[in-house]
């Protein structure tokens, strides 16, 4: 069983020194979170200051939580909704024209439950272009969601999903192809 007295964060795991990490958390809790909804460019600017790769015309709400922005890539015209949590222990990439709806949680980190010291690990998440994750979707570490895929509200994604499909459920399963109407 686990003995947390032996737990430690691996050297370099955060991708930034302690000062950078603490400074980001202070900025996120204040001038990022307190900014008016319409100041998308301001929040994109702050994220870029901390090393995020942010495309043009990104919509990111002030209530979004990002653990380490230097591990985040947002493509052009990506939208990230209210109360989304981007747990960037590992890299998160969200493709152009993709929507991550409110209260969704993208989780790149976990612990080894078999390890006595509860070893922490991180695996990247990739959301393709033109995807839509509806409200309150959970995405597990290591998942890739193919271009054009829709994941229904309150779904949990534990395995990678192919391109151009509609999925839902816990665990999320493909229910049909996504066909463009225009």
Q: Residue spans of the language-model regions?
A:
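Flexible, glycine/small-residue-enriched loop-and-beta-strand segment within the central core
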Residues: 35-44, 61-74, 79-144, 170-171, ...
